[in-house]
């Protein structure tokens, strides 16, 4: 059976923003979450929930969405780069989208029970700000980053208990990690306040890790930045967030892109803008000038009488965005510079030129003549 289109599954347009996609997923996740659907419709609701989660995971990731937009389902490998729609991690995306809004109803942060009846917690997501140049954003790059990580404590072998001792079953929750409270007609399930959901208490914590069972360290990750990425976009590295508890899945790492200010270009979507300074002689007489692009040099032919602020468009000399079929354009804005620090001889030549131009009147300076007439009308 063919998979449904991810955009159709979430009920959003193909150009939907990240926020629109997240809102649509939240709505569907709330509607179809298994804890809200019991009885005859439970199986269908679970399938719908998994479909929505899979669509959200693909479309909320810049790289995966770009691949899906270009190649469809064939462009995304379900065995790489993230959690699948099923398996023991199937409900992680719900916690990511909703946080702990429904903690008292569904359990804190979307946790599940492990094989021993203990609460299983998904690890927290981490964020990492990466600054790159405009050139790197346009062409993409492969790079490495170092992020905080956790290793199992070698002193206690990850148990959190002092060597020679062991963790005990929590007497408050009898090892379940949860307690049940009755409020009126409702029975509410909450995380055990004594063991914080682990189902165990440690009478004598390991001194090396303070009972955590893990030691903070660092690890190096390979990161592929797609060509055309823009300011504020995020790359998700699945499973590289904080580790889960009691065998729960790790959170994700979100790498947020920041682009350094460029000396020449300003980016606007897929388009680039730059200011080209020229002298009054070049502006007056015209001629060919060289302008920079991200791919090298290009040439613009200036007509005679080019005015300050005139814009020239070079098609295809912008940036090809991650979800664009064609590159944007480069807009060159002319800035006519007034000469400074003139010699007396140069001043004399300019005065002579000015006198000569005044004789031509409107023919040489049509805008000045029009402006003068408007000023006269203002003071009539």
UniProtKB/Swiss-Prot annotation:
CR-type zinc-finger residues: 140-218
Keyword Nucleus (UniProt): no
Disulphide linkage map: none
Residue segments, region Disordered: 357-380
Residues annotated as binding Zn(2+) 1: 153, 156, 206, 209
CXXCXGXG motif repeats: 153-160, 170-177, 192-199, 206-213
Cofactor mode of binding and number, as noted: Binds 2 Zn(2+) ions per monomer.
Main location: cytoplasm
Cofactor: Zn(2+)
Entry keyword annotation includes Chaperone: yes
Gene Ontology biological-process annotations: chaperone cofactor-dependent protein refolding; DNA replication; protein refolding; response to heat
Entry binding sites for Zn(2+) 2: 170, 173, 192, 195
Record GO terms (molecular function): ATP binding; heat shock protein binding; unfolded protein binding; zinc ion binding
Residues of the J domain: 5-72
One Gene Ontology cellular component: cytoplasm
InterPro entries found in the cross-reference section: DnaJ (IPR012724), DnaJ_C (IPR002939), DnaJ_domain (IPR001623), DnaJ_domain_CS (IPR018253), HSP40/DnaJ_pept-bd (IPR008971), HSP_DnaJ_Cys-rich_dom (IPR001305), HSP_DnaJ_Cys-rich_dom_sf (IPR036410), J_dom_sf (IPR036869)
Keywords of this entry: Chaperone, Cytoplasm, DNA replication, Metal-binding, Repeat, Stress response, Zinc, Zinc-finger
Location(s), subcellular: Cytoplasm
Subunit structure as annotated in this protein's UniProt entry: Homodimer.
NCBIfam families attached to this UniProt entry: DnaJ_bact, PRK10767.1
Domain free text: The J domain is necessary and sufficient to stimulate DnaK ATPase activity. Zinc center 1 plays an important role in the autonomous, DnaK-independent chaperone activity of DnaJ. Zinc center 2 is essential for interaction with DnaK and for DnaJ activity.
Entry similarity comment: Belongs to the DnaJ family.
Function per UniProt: Participates actively in the response to hyperosmotic and heat shock by preventing the aggregation of stress-denatured proteins and by disaggregating proteins, also in an autonomous, DnaK-independent fashion. Unfolded proteins bind initially to DnaJ; upon interaction with the DnaJ-bound protein, DnaK hydrolyzes its bound ATP, resulting in the formation of a stable complex. GrpE releases ADP from DnaK; ATP binding to DnaK triggers the release of the substrate protein, thus completing the reaction cycle.
Annotated protein name in UniProt: Chaperone protein DnaJ
Taxonomic placement: Bacteria, Pseudomonadati, Pseudomonadota, Betaproteobacteria, Burkholderiales
Gene this chain is encoded by: dnaJ
């Amino acid at each position: 059976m063919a998979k449904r289109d991810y955009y159709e599954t979430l009920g959003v347009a193909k150009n939907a923003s990240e926020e629109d996609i997240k809102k649509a997923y939240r709505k569907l996740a709330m509607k179809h979450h298994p804890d809200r659907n019991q009885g005859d419709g439970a199986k269908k609701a679970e399938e719908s929930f998994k479909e929505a989660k899979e669509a959200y995971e693909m479309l909320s990731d810049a790289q995966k969405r770009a691949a899906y937009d270009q190649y469809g389902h064939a462009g995304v490998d379900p065995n790489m780069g993230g959690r699948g729609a099923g398996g023991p991690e199937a409900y992680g995306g719900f916690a990511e989208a909703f946080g702990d809004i429904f903690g008292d109803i569904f359990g804190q942060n979307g946790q599940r029970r492990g094989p021993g009846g203990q609460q299983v917690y998904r690890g927290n997501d981490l964020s990492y700000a990466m600054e790159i140049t405009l050139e790197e954003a346009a062409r993409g790059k492969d790079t490495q980053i170092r992020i905080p990580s956790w290793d199992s404590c070698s002193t206690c072998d990850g148990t959190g208990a002092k060597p020679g001792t062991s963790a005990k079953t929590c007497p408050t929750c009898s090892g379940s990690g949860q307690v049940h409270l009755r409020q009126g007609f409702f029975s509410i399930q909450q995380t055990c306040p004594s063991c914080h959901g682990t189902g165990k208490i440690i009478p004598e914590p390991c001194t090396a890790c303070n009972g955590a069972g893990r030691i903070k360290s660092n690890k190096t990750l390979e990161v592929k930045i797609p060509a055309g990425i823009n300011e504020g976009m995020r790359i998700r590295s699945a499973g590289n967030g904080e580790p889960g508890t009691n065998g729960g899945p790790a959170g994700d790492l979100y790498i947020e892109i920041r682009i350094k200010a460029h000396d020449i270009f300003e980016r606007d979507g897929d388009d680039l803008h730059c200011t080209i300074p020229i002298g009054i002689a070049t502006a007056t007489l015209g001629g060919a000038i060289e302008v920079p692009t991200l791919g090298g040099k290009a040439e613009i032919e200036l007509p005679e009488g080019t005015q300050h602020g005139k814009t020239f468009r070079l098609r295809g000399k912008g940036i090809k965005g991650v979800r664009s079929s064609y590159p944007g354009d480069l807009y060159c804005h002319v800035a006519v510079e007034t000469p400074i620090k003139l010699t007396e001889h140069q001043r004399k030549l300019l005065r002579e030129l000015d006198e000569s131009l005044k004789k031509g009147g409107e023919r040489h300076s049509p805008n000045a003549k029009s402006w003068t007439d408007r000023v006269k009308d203002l003071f009539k």
